[in-house]
Structures are given as C-alpha cells and as structure tokens.
Amino acid sequence: MERKRYIFGNWKMHKTAKEAKDYLSVFCPLLEEVAPVSCVGITPAFTALHACCESIKFFHSPLWLGAQNVHQDTSGAFTGEISLPMLKEFDVNFVLLGHSECRHIFHEEDTTIALKVGAAAREGIIPVLCIGETLEVREKGATEAMLSNQLMLGLAQLPETASVIIAYEPVWAIGTGKVASAVDVQEAHAFCREVLANIFSKEKAEEISILYGGSVKADNAEGFARCPDVDGLLVGGASLDPKVFADVVANFHR
C-alpha cells in the first residue's frame, strides 16, 4: 500500500488576512500548473483562516487548510485560545501539534499535546504530531530515546482507528540554515516507523505518513523525496513566497 504524501507550509506568525489573499491569488494557479500527487496545504495565522478559506473556495483549489495549534477543550475560560469547533467553521483539514516552538517557547508538555492529538482526531481534523531532537540531545547520542518518548506520549490519546501524520523536525535544523542530510533523515524516519509499529502494529505503521521539516528549500526537496520513509515535507520560511513554495512542491515530485 502506497502511503499518501503531504507538503505543508507553516507560515508561523506571518501574513495578515490581506497578505494571505494576495499570496493565494498567485499560489493557487501555480499549484494547478504543478498538479502534484501530494496533498499540499498551508497553516496561516488564526486571523487569516477565514480569508484563506474563502480564497481556496474561490479558486476551486485542492489546497488544504491547516491550523498551527488548537486547545484540547471545545470551549471554556481559556483566554486567547482557539477551539476545534472554531477551526471547523473554516473547513480546516489538519492541525500542527507539538511544534518545537510550542514545546520550547511556550513550554507545552507531551501530556497536553497528547490531549490535543486525541481531541483533533475525534473532531475529524487530522493531527500532525511534530517531534524532533535538540542539538544538545543529538550531541549526547540520545536522539532515538527522545523521538521514541515523544511518539509514545504524544500518541497516547489517539483513537485506535484515527488518522495521524507525523512530522520529524530536528530542532537544530529549524530556521537555522543547517540541513540534516538525506541519510540522517531516512534513518530517523525509519526509526520512527519502528516505534510506530511497536505502538500500533506493523501494518498501521506502514500506513502513517512521516514528513520531514527543517530548513527545507526548493534545492533540497528532491533529495528528501528519494528517501523511502519520507512521505512529504513541512516547510517553514520557503513557504512564505508563493513561487518558491510552488518550486518546492514541483521539485519534490521530480
């Protein structure tokens, strides 16, 4: 069974609603030209979700819409938070959870991330569980222990039959310009699949798509595509320019 491929652009705290609309007026036609086999998506800021939703409908685009985070409860006294029902109003398909910036800047813990993963899956929004080791952990030779721990804890609340996507992003390669080699990435992804087989089953593990993120650019996307356990990309800075992001998508399918 061939795994589904995904390429997601994470805009982080960039682009107003107007800027997002201008972006999609360029990107949606480019995506149609590229006609990728992969499912392509973007995660704008919460304030731009409505504008993106409307633009995607206007262009009749297959582009997926994602969110950068979400609260695990459907409502409540949680100032500044966004709920899953709110995301569903904008036809959100997927949500990033456990991104390294949320873990390290906002101190999100694995137990909280697990609750979010389970809640998203139950609401019909695909959780994208982000994992990855820090430079300190890597230098200590403890990468596998950290990845295994993040997977086991982060997936603890996932319903048995629910879909999930894993995104491996070595923290030391995010926004630093440092890029993990294709060999290193393949080894990490293969290890993650072994862990998934232990958590679920070998059959389930073979169905789960694992994406790579970490200074992904148009000129290295093709190399990652050749790795047998890399099923797509989570793109940061290179997704902020519509033409560059379209090149990333095109090169991944060469």
Swiss-Prot record:
Annotated pathway: Carbohydrate biosynthesis; gluconeogenesis; Carbohydrate degradation; glycolysis; D-glyceraldehyde 3-phosphate from glycerone phosphate: step 1/1
Catalytic activity line of the entry: D-glyceraldehyde 3-phosphate = dihydroxyacetone phosphate
GO molecular function: triose-phosphate isomerase activity
Residues annotated as the enzyme's active site: 99 (electrophile), 169 (proton acceptor)
Signal sequence range: none
Keywords recorded for this protein, A-Z: Cytoplasm, Gluconeogenesis, Glycolysis, Isomerase
Subunit and partners: Homodimer.
Alphabetical list of Pfam families matching this protein: TIM
Family: Belongs to the triosephosphate isomerase family.
Matches recorded under SUPFAM superfamilies: Triosephosphate isomerase (TIM)
PANTHER family documented for this protein: TRIOSEPHOSPHATE ISOMERASE
UniProt-recorded name of the protein: Triosephosphate isomerase
EC number from the UniProt entry: 5.3.1.1
Organism: Chlamydia abortus (strain DSM 27085 / S26/3) (Chlamydophila abortus)
Localization: Cytoplasm
